[in-house]
């Protein structure tokens, strides 16, 4: 301890010696370089891994500055004027009423009739929305009308409800029964009805789409293809029910129903343009420079912002599910909140807007992937690469779903590695453009040619170009300049034909 105190007391005297300063510099360099080498060798990372393995996961660290993160959207408020939809199992599907209601509509496949046909009247047509006799709840009429319209007009193009009857008793609520075995001159209506319902719901239901060809490969893997609307159930029952969180809500069913004839559409509509993107803080004040999602739009984390570079990619390319979702959020923020319309007008407006905001090709592509039992996008969770230093993000990509659960990060490892590399490239290009804009071209030229001059001078110095002649066996003749014959014009060297040689400067 005394030696340490003595060392600190003698620091001023030590620094005065140049040799001591050199030793201190060498010691610091060795310590720093040794620490860097120790970190690069991997022993520290191994110790950290052994301590935290199986106990903690801070996220997917791609490299020293890039990290794989995700954002999950809450779409319930966006579609608060539309019925919420979900499936409990192969036979029960539910539609919840708009926001602020506690009722719902239950769709059930069964082999047992719920009522005697003598107590029910036939539904002739929906051409004029004539279902008032079937709705005794005075609250679900519009939702029921919208549901039946979508099932029959927009998907099936069927104006007559073959085999459909409803209960008309007062205070009986809603009870509509379809006989799926009844046919018509145009084909089996029940089969088309099940096909359209499965298309809207979008779930892979063996009981709803059961007539398929089972294609098996050589390795034993089998896949159902060319599925048609078919079910072994005889009746489809539509009735009112209370909403008791029967199942988890998914926005895809609502989006599919709002998109008119999406399954048969082969030409994509022209998408509506974006609004002006800007950042809004937690209090709602707008700050130019990017786009922030409000708290209601996220499942977790209070607020999430994306910079202008991400939004610019959406404005340029309309081929990402994330861009579709951002259009819906932006429309909901700037249009729906300013409207004072009743439920029916709001639904019609939102349907028309969704048709111009959502890309047909993306929805069709994901629907086909879901039917083919390969990973697809459900428009709720997106992953992106975050630069922890500059806080820049890559364009979020959809986190694909398979068998009702999200894929593990390792399943799309190549994708986020490519996004990380692209983020690096974008950063380098941006820094280069900024540097070019701040540096005068003349100064850049001077710097370049001075570097060329320095490089040439170093090369010439290494080559060793001779500068004057010497007479062999004698000293340097300077300041005399000897000719190739060994003579000097002043007469000091006057004996001709002596051997001479070229010598570099200083020799």
Swiss-Prot record:
A single Gene Ontology CC term: host cell endoplasmic reticulum membrane
State the Pfam families in the record.
Arena_glycoprot (PF00798)
Q: Name one GO biological process term.
A: fusion of virus membrane with host endosome membrane
Gene Ontology molecular function terms on file: metal ion binding
Keyword annotations of the record? Disulfide bond, Fusion of virus membrane with host endosomal membrane, Fusion of virus membrane with host membrane, Glycoprotein, Host cell membrane, Host endoplasmic reticulum, Host Golgi apparatus, Host membrane, Host-virus interaction, Lipoprotein, Membrane, Metal-binding, Myristate, Transmembrane, Transmembrane helix, Viral attachment to host cell, Viral envelope protein, Viral penetration into host cytoplasm, Virion, Virus endocytosis by host, Virus entry into host cell, Zinc
Q: What's the entry's take on its domains?
A: The cytoplasmic domain of GP2 plays a role in ER location. It also contains a zinc-binding domain that allows SSP retention in the GPC complex by accepting a cysteine from SSP as the fourth ligand.
- Could you identify this protein by its name? Pre-glycoprotein polyprotein GP complex
Annotated source species? Parana mammarenavirus (isolate Rat/Paraguay/12056/1965)
Output the lineage of the source organism.
Answer: Viruses, Riboviria, Orthornavirae, Negarnaviricota, Polyploviricotina
């Amino acid at each position: 301890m005394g030696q340490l105190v003595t060392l600190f007391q003698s620091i001023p005297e030590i620094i005065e010696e140049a040799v001591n300063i050199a030793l201190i510099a060498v010691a610091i360099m060795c310590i720093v370089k040794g620490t860097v080498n120790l970190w690069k060798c991997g022993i520290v990372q191994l110790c950290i891994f052994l301590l935290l393995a199986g106990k903690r996961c801070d996220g997917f660290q791609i490299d020293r500055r890039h990290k794989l993160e995700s954002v999950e959207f809450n779409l319930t408020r966006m579609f608060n004027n539309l019925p919420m939809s979900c499936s409990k199992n192969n036979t029960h599907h539910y539609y919840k009423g708009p926001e602020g209601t506690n009722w719902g509509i239950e769709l059930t496949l069964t082999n047992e009739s719920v009522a005697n046909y003598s107590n029910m009247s036939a539904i002739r047509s929906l051409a004029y929305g004539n279902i008032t006799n079937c709705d005794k709840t005075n609250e679900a009429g519009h939702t029921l009308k919208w549901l039946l319209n979508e099932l029959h007009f927009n998907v099936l193009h069927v104006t007559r409800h073959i085999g459909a009857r409803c209960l008309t008793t007062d205070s009986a609520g809603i009870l509509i029964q379809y006989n799926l075995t009844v046919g018509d001159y145009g084909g089996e209506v029940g089969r088309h009805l099940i096909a359209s319902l499965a298309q809207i719901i979008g779930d892979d239901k063996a009981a709803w789409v059961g007539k398929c060809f089972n294609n098996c490969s050589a390795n034993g893997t089998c896949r159902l293809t060319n599925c048609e609307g078919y079910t072994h159930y005889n009746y489809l029952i539509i009735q009112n029910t209370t909403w008791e969180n029967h199942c988890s809500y998914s926005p895809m069913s609502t989006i599919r129903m709002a998109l008119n004839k999406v399954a048969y559409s082969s030409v994509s509509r022209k998408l509506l343009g974006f609004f002006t993107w800007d950042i809004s803080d937690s209090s709602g004040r707008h700050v130019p420079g990017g786009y922030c999602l409000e708290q209601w739009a996220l499942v977790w984390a209070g607020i999430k912002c994306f910079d202008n570079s991400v939004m610019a990619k959406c404005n340029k390319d309309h081929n990402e599910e994330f861009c579709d979702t951002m259009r819906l959020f932006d429309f909901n923020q700037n249009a729906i909140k300013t409207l004072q319309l009743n439920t029916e007008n709001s639904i019609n407006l939102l349907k028309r807007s969704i048709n111009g905001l959502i890309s047909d090709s993306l929805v069709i592509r994901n629907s086909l992937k879901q039917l083919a039992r390969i990973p697809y996008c459900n428009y709720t969770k997106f992953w992106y690469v975050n630069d922890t230093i500059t806080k820049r993000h890559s364009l979020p990509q959809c986190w694909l779903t398979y068998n009702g659960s999200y894929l593990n990060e390792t399943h799309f490892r190549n994708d986020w590695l490519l996004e990380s590399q692209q983020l690096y490239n974008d950063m380098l290009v941006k820094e280069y453009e900024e540097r070019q804009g701040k540096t005068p071209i003349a100064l850049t030229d001077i710097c370049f040619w001075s570097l060329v001059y320095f490089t040439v001078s170093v090369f010439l110095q290494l080559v060793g170009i001779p500068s004057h002649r010497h007479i062999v066996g004698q000293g340097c003749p300077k300041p005399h300049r000897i000719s190739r014959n060994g003579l000097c014009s002043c007469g000091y060297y006057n004996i001709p034909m002596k051997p001479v040689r070229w010598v570099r400067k200083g020799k």
